[in-house]
Protein backbone atom coordinates (compact mmCIF):
# COMPACT_ATOMS: atom_id res chain seq x y z
CA UNK A 1 0.00 0.00 0.00
CA UNK A 2 1.17 3.49 -0.83
CA UNK A 3 -0.94 5.57 1.51
CA UNK A 4 1.95 6.11 3.91
CA UNK A 5 4.71 6.16 1.35
CA UNK A 6 4.36 9.48 -0.38
CA UNK A 7 7.70 10.69 0.87
CA UNK A 8 9.39 7.39 0.16
CA UNK A 9 8.18 7.32 -3.43
CA UNK A 10 9.28 10.80 -4.35
CA UNK A 11 12.33 10.98 -2.14
CA UNK A 12 12.73 13.53 0.61
CA UNK A 13 15.81 15.48 -0.46
CA UNK A 14 14.80 18.60 -2.32
CA UNK A 15 11.23 17.42 -2.75
CA UNK A 16 9.43 18.38 0.42
CA UNK A 17 7.62 21.15 -1.41
CA UNK A 18 5.82 18.45 -3.38
CA UNK A 19 4.67 16.57 -0.30
CA UNK A 20 1.09 17.77 -0.33
CA UNK A 21 -1.66 15.25 -0.86
CA UNK A 22 -3.72 15.70 -3.98
CA UNK A 23 -7.39 14.76 -4.05
CA UNK A 24 -8.29 12.09 -4.66
CA UNK A 25 -4.81 10.55 -5.03
CA UNK A 26 -1.23 11.26 -4.10
CA UNK A 27 1.09 12.83 -6.64
CA UNK A 28 2.65 9.41 -6.81
CA UNK A 29 0.26 6.47 -6.72
CA UNK A 30 -2.73 6.36 -4.43
CA UNK A 31 -3.58 3.67 -1.87
CA UNK A 32 -4.29 1.23 -4.68
CA UNK A 33 -0.63 1.43 -5.75
CA UNK A 34 2.08 -1.12 -5.21
CA UNK A 35 4.47 -1.75 -2.37
CA UNK A 36 6.60 0.81 -0.66
CA UNK A 37 10.14 1.90 -1.21
CA UNK A 38 10.13 2.46 -4.96
CA UNK A 39 11.31 5.92 -5.94
CA UNK A 40 10.32 7.70 -9.10
CA UNK A 41 13.34 8.15 -11.37
CA UNK A 42 13.94 11.32 -13.43
CA UNK A 43 12.63 11.06 -16.96
CA UNK A 44 15.24 11.11 -19.69
CA UNK A 45 13.38 11.13 -23.00
CA UNK A 46 10.02 9.51 -22.43
CA UNK A 47 8.06 9.17 -19.21
CA UNK A 48 8.33 5.69 -17.76
CA UNK A 49 5.34 4.14 -16.07
CA UNK A 50 6.42 2.76 -12.68
CA UNK A 51 5.58 -0.85 -11.96
CA UNK A 52 2.77 -1.62 -9.54
CA UNK A 53 4.93 -4.21 -7.79
CA UNK A 54 8.38 -3.46 -6.39
CA UNK A 55 9.09 -6.54 -4.21
CA UNK A 56 10.50 -4.30 -1.46
CA UNK A 57 7.83 -5.44 0.98
CA UNK A 58 8.26 -9.16 0.43
CA UNK A 59 9.99 -9.62 3.79
CA UNK A 60 7.08 -8.14 5.72
CA UNK A 61 8.34 -4.60 6.21
CA UNK A 62 7.12 -1.25 4.88
CA UNK A 63 8.33 2.34 5.08
CA UNK A 64 6.69 5.24 6.86
CA UNK A 65 6.71 8.75 5.42
CA UNK A 66 9.81 9.41 7.52
CA UNK A 67 11.65 6.56 5.80
CA UNK A 68 11.58 4.30 8.85
CA UNK A 69 11.10 0.59 8.14
CA UNK A 70 8.52 -1.15 10.30
CA UNK A 71 6.79 -4.55 10.25
CA UNK A 72 3.60 -4.53 8.23
CA UNK A 73 1.55 -5.46 11.29
CA UNK A 74 2.85 -2.40 13.16
CA UNK A 75 0.18 -0.23 14.80
CA UNK A 76 0.93 2.58 12.35
CA UNK A 77 0.17 0.40 9.33
CA UNK A 78 -2.88 -1.11 11.01
CA UNK A 79 -4.28 2.40 11.41
CA UNK A 80 -3.33 3.49 7.89
CA UNK A 81 -4.73 0.32 6.36
CA UNK A 82 -8.02 0.65 8.20
CA UNK A 83 -8.49 4.24 7.07
CA UNK A 84 -7.80 3.08 3.51
CA UNK A 85 -10.44 0.38 3.96
CA UNK A 86 -12.81 3.07 5.20
CA UNK A 87 -12.20 5.20 2.13
CA UNK A 88 -12.91 2.19 -0.08
CA UNK A 89 -16.16 1.49 1.77
CA UNK A 90 -17.17 5.13 1.39
CA UNK A 91 -16.39 4.93 -2.33
CA UNK A 92 -18.80 2.01 -2.68
CA UNK A 93 -21.49 3.77 -0.66
CA UNK A 94 -20.98 6.91 -2.72
CA UNK A 95 -21.90 5.02 -5.90
CA UNK A 96 -25.21 3.94 -4.36
CA UNK A 97 -25.83 7.41 -2.97
CA UNK A 98 -25.13 9.02 -6.34
CA UNK A 99 -27.57 6.67 -8.08
CA UNK A 100 -30.28 7.95 -5.75
CA UNK A 101 -29.38 11.58 -6.42
CA UNK A 102 -28.38 12.49 -2.87
CA UNK A 103 -26.55 15.81 -2.79
CA UNK A 104 -24.24 14.73 0.05
CA UNK A 105 -22.36 12.50 -2.41
CA UNK A 106 -20.02 15.45 -2.94
CA UNK A 107 -19.34 15.52 0.78
CA UNK A 108 -18.41 11.84 0.73
CA UNK A 109 -15.84 12.47 -1.98
CA UNK A 110 -14.40 15.33 0.02
CA UNK A 111 -14.21 13.01 3.02
CA UNK A 112 -12.20 10.54 0.96
CA UNK A 113 -9.72 13.33 0.30
CA UNK A 114 -9.62 14.12 4.01
CA UNK A 115 -8.88 10.46 4.71
CA UNK A 116 -5.86 10.69 2.43
CA UNK A 117 -4.61 13.47 4.69
CA UNK A 118 -5.38 11.29 7.72
CA UNK A 119 -3.28 8.49 6.20
CA UNK A 120 -0.41 10.89 5.61
CA UNK A 121 -0.54 12.11 9.22
CA UNK A 122 -0.66 8.56 10.57
CA UNK A 123 2.26 7.55 8.39
CA UNK A 124 4.42 10.22 10.00
CA UNK A 125 5.03 8.84 13.51
CA UNK A 126 6.40 11.62 15.66
CA UNK A 127 9.06 9.41 17.23
CA UNK A 128 10.95 9.36 13.92
CA UNK A 129 9.70 12.56 12.27
CA UNK A 130 11.64 15.72 11.65
CA UNK A 131 10.05 19.16 11.64
CA UNK A 132 9.88 19.14 7.84
CA UNK A 133 7.90 15.89 7.92
CA UNK A 134 5.43 17.21 10.48
CA UNK A 135 4.98 20.47 8.61
CA UNK A 136 3.73 18.70 5.50
CA UNK A 137 1.54 16.08 7.19
CA UNK A 138 -0.05 18.02 10.06
CA UNK A 139 -3.78 17.35 10.38
CA UNK A 140 -5.64 20.47 11.46
CA UNK A 141 -8.99 20.91 13.22
CA UNK A 142 -10.75 22.35 10.16
CA UNK A 143 -12.11 19.02 8.84
CA UNK A 144 -13.49 18.20 12.31
CA UNK A 145 -15.42 21.46 12.41
CA UNK A 146 -16.70 20.94 8.88
CA UNK A 147 -18.06 17.52 9.79
CA UNK A 148 -19.84 19.04 12.78
CA UNK A 149 -21.52 21.60 10.52
CA UNK A 150 -22.69 18.86 8.17
CA UNK A 151 -23.99 16.76 11.07
CA UNK A 152 -26.00 19.68 12.42
CA UNK A 153 -27.41 20.41 8.95
CA UNK A 154 -28.84 16.92 8.46
CA UNK A 155 -29.76 16.26 12.09
CA UNK A 156 -32.09 19.26 12.05
CA UNK A 157 -34.11 17.58 9.28
CA UNK A 158 -34.40 14.15 10.89
CA UNK A 159 -37.07 12.87 13.27
CA UNK A 160 -35.74 12.35 16.81
CA UNK A 161 -34.44 8.92 17.76
CA UNK A 162 -36.79 7.08 20.11
CA UNK A 163 -35.22 3.62 19.94
CA UNK A 164 -32.09 1.83 18.80
CA UNK A 165 -32.10 1.38 15.04
CA UNK A 166 -30.48 -1.46 13.14
CA UNK A 167 -28.33 -0.96 10.04
CA UNK A 168 -31.12 -0.85 7.47
CA UNK A 169 -33.21 1.63 5.48
CA UNK A 170 -32.29 0.66 1.92
CA UNK A 171 -29.04 0.05 0.07
CA UNK A 172 -27.62 3.55 0.47
CA UNK A 173 -28.40 3.70 4.17
CA UNK A 174 -27.10 0.19 4.88
CA UNK A 175 -23.86 0.89 3.00
CA UNK A 176 -23.36 4.06 5.03
CA UNK A 177 -23.96 2.14 8.26
CA UNK A 178 -21.25 -0.28 7.15
CA UNK A 179 -18.92 2.68 6.60
CA UNK A 180 -19.77 3.89 10.10
CA UNK A 181 -18.74 0.54 11.60
CA UNK A 182 -15.44 0.55 9.68
CA UNK A 183 -14.88 4.12 10.85
CA UNK A 184 -15.31 3.07 14.47
CA UNK A 185 -12.68 0.40 13.95
CA UNK A 186 -10.34 2.95 12.39
CA UNK A 187 -10.82 5.15 15.44
CA UNK A 188 -9.92 2.23 17.71
CA UNK A 189 -6.71 1.71 15.72
CA UNK A 190 -5.80 5.40 15.95
CA UNK A 191 -6.46 6.03 19.65
CA UNK A 192 -3.39 4.05 20.85
CA UNK A 193 -1.17 6.08 18.50
CA UNK A 194 -2.57 9.30 19.95
CA UNK A 195 -2.01 8.04 23.49
CA UNK A 196 1.59 7.14 22.62
CA UNK A 197 2.14 10.61 21.18
CA UNK A 198 2.77 9.25 17.68
CA UNK A 199 0.00 11.19 15.94
CA UNK A 200 -2.15 14.27 16.42
CA UNK A 201 -5.31 14.09 18.53
CA UNK A 202 -7.20 15.80 15.70
CA UNK A 203 -6.98 12.56 13.72
CA UNK A 204 -8.93 10.66 16.39
CA UNK A 205 -11.39 13.54 16.72
CA UNK A 206 -11.97 13.51 12.98
CA UNK A 207 -12.75 9.79 12.91
CA UNK A 208 -15.04 10.16 15.89
CA UNK A 209 -17.04 12.90 14.17
CA UNK A 210 -16.96 11.02 10.89
CA UNK A 211 -18.71 8.02 12.41
CA UNK A 212 -21.40 10.39 13.71
CA UNK A 213 -21.69 11.96 10.27
CA UNK A 214 -22.04 8.57 8.58
CA UNK A 215 -24.74 7.56 11.06
CA UNK A 216 -26.58 10.80 10.39
CA UNK A 217 -26.47 10.63 6.60
CA UNK A 218 -27.46 6.94 6.72
CA UNK A 219 -30.66 7.99 8.47
CA UNK A 220 -31.05 10.95 6.13
CA UNK A 221 -30.74 8.70 3.06
CA UNK A 222 -33.39 6.34 4.42
CA UNK A 223 -35.74 9.25 5.07
CA UNK A 224 -35.24 10.79 1.62
CA UNK A 225 -35.76 7.44 -0.10
CA UNK A 226 -38.87 6.68 1.93
CA UNK A 227 -37.29 3.53 3.36
CA UNK A 228 -38.18 2.35 6.82
CA UNK A 229 -35.45 1.94 9.42
CA UNK A 230 -35.68 -1.27 11.38
CA UNK A 231 -35.93 -0.90 15.15
CA UNK A 232 -34.17 -3.07 17.70
CA UNK A 233 -36.53 -5.39 19.56
CA UNK A 234 -35.40 -7.52 22.46
CA UNK A 235 -35.59 -11.21 21.64
CA UNK A 236 -37.54 -13.03 24.32
CA UNK A 237 -36.60 -16.68 24.68
Curated annotation (Swiss-Prot):
GO BP field: cobalamin metabolic process
Enzyme class label: transferase
Modified residues (Phosphoserine): 128
Domain of life: Eukaryota
N6-acetyllysine PTM sites in chain numbering: 224
Keyword annotations of the record: Acetylation, ATP-binding, Mitochondrion, Nucleotide-binding, Phosphoprotein, Transferase, Transit peptide
Sequence segments annotated as region (Disordered): 30-49
E.C. code: 2.5.1.-
A GO molecular-function descriptor: ATP binding
Gene3D superfamilies attached to this UniProt entry: Cobalamin adenosyltransferase-like
Positions annotated to bind ATP: 54-57, 62-63, 72, 184-188, 208
Catalytic activity: cob(I)alamin-[corrinoid adenosyltransferase] + ATP = apo-[corrinoid adenosyltransferase] + adenosylcob(III)alamin + triphosphate
Signal peptide (residue range): none
Main location: mitochondrion
Residue interval of the organelle targeting sequence: 1-26
One cellular component term from this protein's GO annotations in UniProt: mitochondrion
Residues the record lists as N6-succinyllysine modifications: 205, 224
InterPro entries named among the record's database cross-references: CblAdoTrfase-like, CblAdoTrfase-like_sf, PduO-typ
Subcellular location: Mitochondrion
Its biological purpose: Converts cob(I)alamin to adenosylcobalamin (adenosylcob(III)alamin), a coenzyme for methylmalonyl-CoA mutase, therefore participates in the final step of the vitamin B12 conversion. Generates adenosylcobalamin (AdoCbl) and directly delivers the cofactor to MUT in a transfer that is stimulated by ATP-binding to MMAB and gated by MMAA.
Quaternary structure and partners: Homotrimer.
The family this protein is said to belong to: Belongs to the Cob(I)alamin adenosyltransferase family.
Protein name: Corrinoid adenosyltransferase MMAB
Organism placement in taxonomy: Eukaryota, Metazoa, Chordata, Craniata, Vertebrata
Gene assigned in the entry: Mmab
Amino acid sequence: MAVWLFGGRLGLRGRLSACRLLCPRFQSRGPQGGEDGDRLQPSSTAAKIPKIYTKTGDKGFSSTFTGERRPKDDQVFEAVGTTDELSSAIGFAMELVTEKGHMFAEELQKIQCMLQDVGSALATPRSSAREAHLKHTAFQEGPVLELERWIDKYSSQLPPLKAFILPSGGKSSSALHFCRAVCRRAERRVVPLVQMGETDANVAKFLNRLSDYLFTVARYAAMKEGSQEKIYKKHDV
